[in-house]
Regions:
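Non-globular targeting/processing and membrane-anchoring segments
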Residues: 1-2, 85-92, 97-140
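Structural alpha/beta surface segment adjacent to cysteine/selenocysteine redox centers
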Residues: 3-9, 13-74
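Glycine-rich loops and low-complexity Gly/Arg-rich segments
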Residues: 29-31, 52-57, 81-83, 120-123, ...
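Active-site phosphate/pyrophosphate- and oxyanion-stabilizing loops and adjacent acidic/basic residues
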Residues: 44, 82, 109
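Thioredoxin-like thiol-disulfide oxidoreductase module
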Residues: 65, 73-88
Length: 140
């Protein structure tokens, strides 16, 4: 079972998503995208696989967003991708790729939609929120 996560270890949502993947018994390929950003083609493929607009992958609460005036609706998709490649911190995360699909996992529970294997046991997020019970079932 091949799973890849575009991960930022400084992000709680990314850490929780990685932990949910591991709670399913899988050990994913981890791409630290701030250190090793995707290529232009890879980024385009990820966006297409998620079926989201380019702008939906753009982080807004980081300094380059304001400095580059990215809130303005004057940039093409290609220009937005250029900005994300020049400033990988602008790429929202975590992105997870599995045989069942590709998702921007915000919130982290989105990963459950595409994991090939069920959860193996209880899971509690870093903030204390119970997500999975002892039987491996989603807590509503």
């Amino acid at each position: 079972m091949s799973i890849t996560i575009y991960h930022n270890p400084d992000c709680g949502t990314s850490r929780n998503t990685l932990a949910l993947i591991r709670n399913s018994g899988a050990e994913p390929t981890i791409i630290y995208y701030l250190e090793t950003p995707p290529s232009r083609d890879e980024l385009r493929q990820l966006i297409a696989a998620m079926a989201i607009p380019v702008r939906a992958l753009l982080r807004q609460n980081v300094e380059p967003y304001d400095a580059l005036c990215l809130a303005e609706d004057r940039f093409t998709d290609d220009q937005l991708i250029d900005f994300m490649l020049q400033h990988p911190i602008l790429i929202n995360r975590p992105i997870v790729v599995t045989p069942r699909g590709t998702r921007l996992c915000r919130p982290s529970e989105v990963v459950l939609e595409i994991l090939p294997a069920p959860q193996k046991g209880a899971f509690v997020k870093e903030d204390g929120e119970r997500v999975i019970d002892r039987a491996g079932q989603r807590v509503k």
